[in-house]
Curated annotation (Swiss-Prot):
GO cellular component: catalytic step 2 spliceosome; cytosol; nucleus; post-mRNA release spliceosomal complex; precatalytic spliceosome; SMN-Sm protein complex; spliceosomal tri-snRNP complex; U1 snRNP
The protein, known as: Small nuclear ribonucleoprotein G
Subcellular location: Nucleus; Cytoplasm
CDD domains xrefs: Sm_G (cd01719)
Subunit details: Belongs to the 40S cdc5-associated complex (or cwf complex), a spliceosome sub-complex reminiscent of a late-stage spliceosome composed of the U2, U5 and U6 snRNAs and at least brr2, cdc5, cwf2/prp3, cwf3/syf1, cwf4/syf3, cwf5/ecm2, spp42/cwf6, cwf7/spf27, cwf8, cwf9, cwf10, cwf11, cwf12, prp45/cwf13, cwf14, cwf15, cwf16, cwf17, cwf18, cwf19, cwf20, cwf21, cwf22, cwf23, cwf24, cwf25, cwf26, cyp7/cwf27, cwf28, cwf29/ist3, lea1, msl1, prp5/cwf1, prp10, prp12/sap130, prp17, prp22, sap61, sap62, sap114, sap145, slu7, smb1, smd1, smd3, smf1, smg1 and syf2.
Residue ranges constituting the Sm domain according to the UniProt record: 4-76
Highest taxon listed in the record's lineage: Eukaryota
Function: Plays a role in pre-mRNA splicing as a core component of the spliceosomal U1, U2, U4 and U5 small nuclear ribonucleoproteins (snRNPs), the building blocks of the spliceosome.
Length: 77
């Protein structure tokens, strides 16, 4: 069995990201931190509900086992 290292999200820190979560949940926010389990911290977050409604949720910590995908919304240089 191979050892998995920490996710390489350094290039996404302090950038606006889109996070797809299990249960068809979507969150947008600024990535402020993460750990080896893909637990992440977002600030200025907005949750997009299934019906399209957007709800400001501010700062949020998301457990890594809920994360399906993380995508930056800022242009990478």
């Amino acid at each position: 069995m191979s050892k998995a290292g920490a996710p390489d999200l350094k290039k996404y820190l302090d950038r606006q990201v889109f996070v797809q979560l299990n249960g068809s949940r979507k969150v947008y926010g600024v990535l402020r931190g993460y750990d080896i389990f893909l637990n992440i911290v977002l600030e200025d977050s907005i949750e997009e509900k299934v019906d399209g409604e957007k709800v400001k949720i501010g700062s949020v910590a998301i457990r890594g086992n809920s994360v399906i995908m993380i995508e930056t919304l800022d242009k990478m240089t």
